[in-house]
């Protein structure tokens, strides 16, 4: 079996933000994140993820607009819950929008969206995007209250923040965080939402997450960009997809369908 060309087992979303970070470091036109996205598709990526931040530190508006009509898979646009970003998303019309928390001083997204604390605002954002024909995902911590709030807000998809798992410093902490994610996946299924995951995943920690049968999609970027420095971009994409699919196929957890959960 060619693992990187195995659709439907588990999807890989390639985040191209850090290709844009390299480009912007010198203010050049290269490396081109659009070219990276198209090559990633050829190498087996099931979707392309990119984060249009309010400060435009990596991805620019022009990148999103230029890339949207060229993709053969799906565009998953990450953005903050602000009216400016929601309006941009509705204008561009990606297949998916993942709403994320955002602080200007952070290096990368540091935690999940607080849907419980900002319920009315998130619910309104979900409605605006859904009315524009865009599927909405909420990037949240693996927490039962946040999952319930996400479902109540009208989000058909959640993306579980795997940062604490990725940053675990010993086996006990790692196992505890993995159990937390597994429990959150079950909770998401119970609420009838599609469950994705991502943040901090790389070539040696992705396997246990990819093996969880209830997870539909993993979004990974920095690790692939970093690995590509040594392995080459398309090889890096292929290797990550192969690792994920192999982990899922070798999992002892039955990959049973869950009625009522959107795909």
Curated annotation (Swiss-Prot):
InterPro entries: Aldolase_TIM (IPR013785), PyrdxlP_synth_PdxJ (IPR004569), Pyridoxine-5'_phos_synth (IPR036130). Pfam families: PdxJ (PF03740). The record marks 159 as: Transition state stabilizer. Its EC number is 2.6.99.2. The active site is at residues 51, 78, 199. GO terms for biological process: pyridoxine biosynthetic process. 1-deoxy-D-xylulose 5-phosphate binds at residues 17-18, 53, 58, 108. Keywords: Cytoplasm, Pyridoxine biosynthesis, Transferase. It is found in: Cytoplasm. Homooctamer; tetramer of dimers. Belongs to the PNP synthase family. This is Pyridoxine 5'-phosphate synthase. It comes from Ralstonia pickettii (strain 12J). The gene is pdxJ.
């Amino acid at each position: 079996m060619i693992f990187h060309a195995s659709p439907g087992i588990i999807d890989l979303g390639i985040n191209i933000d850090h290709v844009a970070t390299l480009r912007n470091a010198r203010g050049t036109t290269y490396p081109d994140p659009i070219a990276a996205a198209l090559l990633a598709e050829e190498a087996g990526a099931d979707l392309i993820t990119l984060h249009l931040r309010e400060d435009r530190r990596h991805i620019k508006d022009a990148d999103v607009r230029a890339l949207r009509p060229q993709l053969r898979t799906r565009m998953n646009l990450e953005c903050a819950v602000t009216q400016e970003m929601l309006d941009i998303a509705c204008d561009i019309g990606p297949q998916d929008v993942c709403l994320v928390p955002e602080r200007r001083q952070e290096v990368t997204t540091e935690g999940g969206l607080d849907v419980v604390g900002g319920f009315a605002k998130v619910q309104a954002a979900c409605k605006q995007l859904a009315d524009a024909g865009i599927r909405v995902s909420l990037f949240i911590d693996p927490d039962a209250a946040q999952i319930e709030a996400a479902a109540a807000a009208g989000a058909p998809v959640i993306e579980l923040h795997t940062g604490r798992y990725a940053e675990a410093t010993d086996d006990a902490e790692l196992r505890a965080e993995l159990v937390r994610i597994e429990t959150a996946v079950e909770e998401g299924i119970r609420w009838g939402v599609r469950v994705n995951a991502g943040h901090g995943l790389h070539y040696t920690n992705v396997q246990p997450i990819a093996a969880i049968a209830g997870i539909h999609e993993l979004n990974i970027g920095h690790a692939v960009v970093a690995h590509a420095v040594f392995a080459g971009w398309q090889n890096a994409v292929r290797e990550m997809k192969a690792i994920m699919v192999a982990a899922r196929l070798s999992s002892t957890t039955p990959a049973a369908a869950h009625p009522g959960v959107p795909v």
